[in-house]
From Swiss-Prot:
One Pfam family in the UniProt entry: AIM5
InterPro entries: Mic12 (IPR031463)
Coiled-coil residue spans: none
Major site of localization recorded for this protein: mitochondrion
Keyword set, alphabetical order: Membrane, Mitochondrion, Mitochondrion inner membrane, Transmembrane, Transmembrane helix
Topology relative to the membrane: Single-pass membrane protein
Assembly and interaction partners: Component of the mitochondrial contact site and cristae organizing system (MICOS) complex.
Official protein name in the record: MICOS complex subunit MIC12
Organism: Candida glabrata (strain ATCC 2001 / BCRC 20586 / JCM 3761 / NBRC 0622 / NRRL Y-65 / CBS 138) (Yeast)
Location in the cell: Mitochondrion inner membrane
One Gene Ontology cellular component: mitochondrial crista junction
């Protein structure tokens, strides 16, 4: 009887995990995964590490009204829009500090909210 119970519980748990993974990652083209906070933070950190601009406009949200060229000089990254107004981004080190402070504040809020 215990072997049947173990097999049944293993089957139930693996079925629930597989179903959860399916609905989280595959169903609706990964809607929940792409919008999760951990993925957004991970993507932002990866952009900083790759020295890509941290200010990103999505075409689906803003359309084609933002067309930029990128100009890199040292650590400074500048975006030059089509109408030639300059939008200057901050240093990568400042962005890393802001990411660190954001995560520390979120952790402190979580610790003291309990």
């Amino acid at each position: 009887m215990s072997k049947i119970a173990k097999l049944g519980s293993f089957t139930l748990v693996s079925g629930v995990v597989a179903t959860s993974c399916y609905y989280y990652f595959i169903d609706r083209d990964g809607y929940h995964y792409k919008r999760s906070v951990w993925k957004q933070v991970g993507d932002e950190v990866q952009r900083v590490i790759d020295r890509k601009p941290s200010l990103v406009f999505s075409k689906e949200k803003y359309g084609d009204q933002f067309d930029y060229d990128y100009k890199v000089s040292g650590e400074r990254v500048e975006r030059v829009p089509v109408d030639h107004k300059q939008l200057v981004l901050r240093y990568n080190s400042e962005t890393m500090k802001d990411l660190w402070n954001k995560e520390v504040r979120a952790l402190v809020d979580w610790v003291y909210s309990r």
